[in-house]
Amino acid sequence: MQTLIGVCWGIILTSPCRRFGGGGKIDPENPKIISVYDALKPKLGENFTLGYERGCDWSATNETAIIREGDPRTERLNMMLMESSDPTNWKAAIKLASESDVVIAALGENPTLCGEARQRKGIRLPGDQERFLKELIATGKPVVLMMFGGRPQVIDEVEAGCAAILQAWYPGEEGGNAVADILLGNVNPSGKLCVSYPKTESEELYCYNNGVSQEKIAYPFGFGLSYTSFEYSGMNVPATAQTTDDFIEISCRVKNTGMREGVEIVQLYLSPESSQSLKPIQLKGFARVNLKP
């Protein structure tokens, strides 16, 4: 049986050096730079067919704005935002998705939308990307959302419709291979979020020294899924400790309860006795452990 994988939208096909490298300067002709699309093709078996359509673009040209009026950089910025190496074809992308067994939607921001001196009026998926993603989901096919960019983005209206979500950030020179290996299950993901994801645009990302909000968030700091599961038990914490000690020893047991080998990031958080502290909860330590079932 032939399985068709539909790749919709173009971050992963065109000019990966700018999409994957953030604001850094790298050589676009360097053969080591590979897109996710090009990384997927040789990794798929003969029973898989990979299709591609660029359904929508990054954003409208006015999505990013320079605050100071009359800034001469505005014209250059608009030209950067209008760059598109592939023409978009919304209908063709939706048609490909409806005919596919699995849909990979590569969305998010590029360095002209998120980077040094780049500002947007909101943090939802830019331009028409959210509407495009909703139409992909409406086909009824499993949609794997890959999000690129340098900050959290609000996805409250689409997350429930996605079969899986992979936050790829700006993955760098080998990002294409790394993301492809995770998508295909060649690598078991183990990363944890270094920021919290807001549920709506009305909430701001908080730092520990701003207290702990009672508002629900989409994904908390330290969150991350795996292709396996882990179980914690036997927490061992000393009843007393000297404040002059360089460290205290805290331990627990971690068991891989899933079906495949995986890495878990064990995180230790501490809270002061006073609830009025400016830092009510802090990450104080972590350990990376590789476990077999």
Each PLM stretch: what is its role?
Residues M1-G21, D27-Y37, K41-N47, G51-L81, ...:
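Secreted, periplasmic, or luminal enzymes acting at the cell surface/secretory milieu
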Residues R18-R19, E109-P126:
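Glycine/threonine-rich flexible loop motifs
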Residues S100:
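An anion/phosphate-binding loop that grips the pyrophosphate of nucleotide cofactors and donors
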